[in-house]
Amino acid sequence: MNKKKIIISTLGMLIATFLVATLIPIQTFALSNAHFSDGFDSANTQAWSKSDGWSNGSMFNCTWRASNVNFRNGAMDLTLNKDSQGGTTPYAGGEYRSNDTYSYGLYQVSMKPAKNTGIVSSFFTYTGPSDNTPWDEIDIEFLGKDTTKVQFNYFTNGVGNHEYVYNLGFDASTSYHTYAFNWQPTYIAWKVDGVEVHRVTNTIPSHPGKIMMNLWPGTGVDSWLGSYDGKTPLNAYYDWVSYDQQ
């Protein structure tokens, strides 16, 4: 091998080494789940999935449809409308869920919930029997009958009934605000626009869960949500989400 070829070969190895050294930390960082965020400019199929073709049953009076999850004007919108695809329910809802699971850390969302009696707009973490794990869940839920309030809740091994309703002092459906929860081994602290408004310290969930958002109408839960009047279409809007391991 002549000197020129040796120099070219060495240069190629140096470039390859630089690229590997540059890319590996980024990949490792992403896989470590230390930070995750999405500005919802478009669908990201590597990170998220649209629920499609099934119903949760029970109090969920809708079938999830991928067509009810859309990305427009730099945000994601979930739609509630009449189901035209012959499902087992009269309505179609939108649900978006992360492909990966996440554990202790700070979860944040900027969103505008839908406003109408009988419906729920949500941001939450979930794992359960469908994932071959106990049912653990942490919720931020807006009951469309009164979007000047937000409801916080959590489930540990399927046990819930920890509802707490916080009076926001504004109508959440009219503009984007940031809602969050900091989940740690010994507590969960919910925040609104960066200010802690509720904290719990008993029977804290421990299993990693998927980040989820959905919009759905209720049935048989009028005492909680109010009676759904069938109004469609309705939309909940999500500007961005983030997770930071803490």
Model-derived features with residue positions:
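GH16 jelly-roll
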Residues: 29-246
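Bacterial N-terminal signal peptides that target proteins for export
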Residues: 2-14
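Bacterial N-terminal signal peptides
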Residues: 12-22
